[in-house]
């Protein structure tokens, strides 16, 4: 029985996009409420943000792709801000899940099980899990290649 989580984990493993932990600390200036965490993409779901030792994670907006965090309330001058979490090399969890969902939908289109029921993640045969992950890897790698194509500096 496949789940989105297990397929997403296998995709991350295939891509070498495994989570790494980080701790980042800064001091507030009393006027800035938006900070760039020097790690991205970050996992916003598990991010812990403290201001002077108080957990304010629920009152912080996280831009997972860019690594920016925005406080609802500007931290006081000289307040210690500590951010603890996980970051990835290439993709956010949402992007990984989208690749898996797209690959699954395309892999199982117009297919049914032995009883004529549509294929779902729950009844996906174990033999079919790896092809879905490989197809999702292909989609992810095409995305990276397309992104890299825009990074080429052609000025001579």
Predicted regions and their residues:
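Elongated alpha-helical scaffolds
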Residues: 127-145
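Short, surface-exposed beta-strand/strand-loop-strand elements in extracellular ectodomains
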Residues: 152-154
């Amino acid at each position: 029985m496949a789940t989105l989580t297990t397929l997403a984990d296998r995709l991350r493993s295939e891509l070498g996009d495994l989570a790494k932990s980080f701790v980042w600390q800064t001091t507030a200036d009393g006027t800035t409420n938006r900070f760039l965490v020097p790690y991205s993409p970050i996992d916003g779901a598990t991010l812990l943000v403290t201001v002077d030792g108080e957990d304010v994670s629920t009152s912080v907006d996280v831009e997972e792709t860019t690594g920016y965090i925005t406080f609802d309330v500007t931290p006081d001058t000289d307040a210690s801000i500590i951010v603890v979490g996980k970051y990835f090399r290439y993709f956010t969890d949402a992007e990984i899940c989208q690749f898996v969902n797209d690959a699954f939908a395309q892999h199982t289109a117009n297919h049914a099980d032995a009883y004529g029921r549509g294929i779902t993640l729950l009844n996906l045969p174990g033999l079919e899990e790896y092809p879905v992950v490989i197809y999702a890897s292909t989609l992810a790698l095409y995305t990276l290649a397309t992104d890299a194509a825009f990074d080429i500096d052609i000025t001579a």
